[in-house]
Regions:
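Bacterial Sec-dependent N-terminal signal peptides
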Residues: 1-21
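Glycan-recognition and catalytic cores of secretory/periplasmic carbohydrate-active enzymes
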Residues: 20-449
Length: 449
């Protein structure tokens, strides 16, 4: 029997499909890994309490309002009623789905089904497949379909990043299907994606690229996921159309043009480039998979090895500073953003799966794992207040400074949304395998079944 080898590695859910080349490793479903007593289990349990403390009817209010239905409770405040209405609701679907997979908690499962049923009611009422909470959504998308596009970094036609906002709903529906097995979520996801095809089918490639100047999350990734879920190539074409060439083209050429850019606008785009490369592996009519995969790896290497600090985080005031000057990182009170590391870990998982150790051809590259471990332990785990479960937006590197944690009723930042997800899925990365070789990826007390 072959000796079991133990290396630091990381995992990715097998449900998200095959890599560009045959994956070096496979991954265990989240429900097969039970956390044992450790700070990670404590973080998971604390997050569970935080998740269930949120009022689903308040999170659903923006979606019902935009569908012309009467909300059952008022919206939350902060970012949830100032233009980004509904973004937490999408993250909430993902968090519930992964928490259910990790714990089997029936209260979580019931909460997820309630959210999905109410969102389905909103979707059916609108009648086009659309689901969203951005104020004035229906007119906004009518204008976009007509080619009336006014895009800036954080707005689209005067609205606060509506593409970014609906990406959270797309991702939440995907996760409800993949992690919790909801057929309803699958149906809603496909209908929602068909709606986007209808909205954008009349837009030229130039209009699409103009629209993508507005932050849009990882829509290209989720559309590639829909392509794999359904086996329908039209969704893969949509994913490619939602890939921002302003970022992609320099990366293909191995050019670092990131200085001054909003960091977490770019990272999800790159996740999408990698995902499209994976799903396109069997597409004989499209021969860019290798270069898109390479672009994602160049981006990762640039950010991890030239733009990150010891905790694995990056950015100052949400933007990439010059790679040869970290002065602002040491002086500013707004250091690395938690959302950035959330997305860098997602990218790292994907790249690791079909990587190659330069010193051992048949083994995956441990450099991806070294970063993953560093960022998970020092940034993600530390971003949660361990008793009450609040989440951190910025982790300052400024000596002697402090961090500010969210409050469940009043804080609805982006890093609250990603924070809800971060602590649900620790078990997904602990183990991996290939044939008769088991990789113990993270030294977290746990039981594999």
């Amino acid at each position: 029997m072959k000796t079991t080898s133990f290396i630091l590695a990381l995992v990715l859910s097998t449900s998200l499909g095959k890599a560009q080349n045959a994956p070096q490793v496979s991954y265990f479903p989240l429900q097969n890994v039970k956390l044992l007593d450790s700070p990670f289990l404590q973080a998971q349990q604390t997050d569970l309490h935080y998740i269930l403390a949120l009022d689903p009817d308040r999170l659903l209010a923006p979606f019902l309002r935009e569908a012309g239905l009467q909300p059952k409770a008022p919206s939350y405040t902060n970012w949830e009623n100032t233009g980004l209405d509904g973004h937490i609701g999408g993250h909430y679907l993902s968090a519930l789905s992964m928490m259910y997979a990790a714990t089997g908690d029936t209260a979580v499962y019931n909460r997820l089904n309630y959210m999905l049923n109410e969102l389905n009611r909103a979707q059916q009422t609108v009648g086009t497949g659309f689901i969203g909470g951005t104020p004035g959504s229906l007119q906004l998308w009518k204008d976009i379909k007509a080619g009336k596009i006014r895009a800036g970094g954080f707005d689209l036609n005067g609205k606060w990043v509506p593409l970014y906002n609906i990406h959270k709903t797309y991702a939440g529906l995907r996760d409800a299907y993949l992690y919790a097995g909801s057929d309803l979520a699958r149906q809603m996801l496909i209908a929602f994606t068909d709606w986007m095809i209808d909205i954008t089918s009349g837009l030229s490639d130039e209009q699409m690229q103009d629209m993508l100047r507005s932050e849009h999350g990882g829509l290209n990734e989720t559309f590639a996921d829909v392509a794999e879920i359904t086996g329908d190539k039209k969704y893969l074409e949509l994913a490619r159309r939602f890939s921002h060439k302003l970022i992609l083209d320099p990366l293909i050429k191995e050019e670092d043009k990131l200085t001054g850019m909003h960091a977490n606008t770019q990272i999800p785009k790159v996740i999408g480039y990698k995902r499209i490369a994976e799903v396109s592996q069997d597409d004989k009519t499209w021969n860019h998979a290798a270069e898109w995969d390479h672009a994602a790896r160049f981006f990762w290497n640039t950010v991890v090895n030239h733009r990150s600090v010891c905790i694995g985080g990056n950015s100052v005031r949400e933007h990439f500073h010059p790679s040869d000057n970290f002065t602002s990182m040491l002086n500013d009170v707004q250091g690395p953003e938690t959302c950035n590391t959330y997305n860098m870990l997602r990218l790292t998982k994907m790249l690791y799966q079909n990587s190659h150790n330069p010193n051992q051809t048949n083994e995956p590259d441990p450099n991806y794992v070294n970063y993953y471990e560093r960022a998970l332990y020092n940034h993600i785990l530390a971003s949660q207040e361990p008793d009450k479960g609040g989440f951190v937006y910025f982790t300052p590197m400024r000596p002697g400074h402090y961090r500010v944690y969210s409050q469940p009723e009043t804080s609805m930042w982006c890093c609250v949304g990603s924070g809800l997800e971060n602590h649900t899925k620790y078990g997904e990365f602990i183990y991996a395998y290939r044939k008769d070789t088991l990789y113990v990826n993270l030294f977290i007390p746990s039981q594999l079944t």
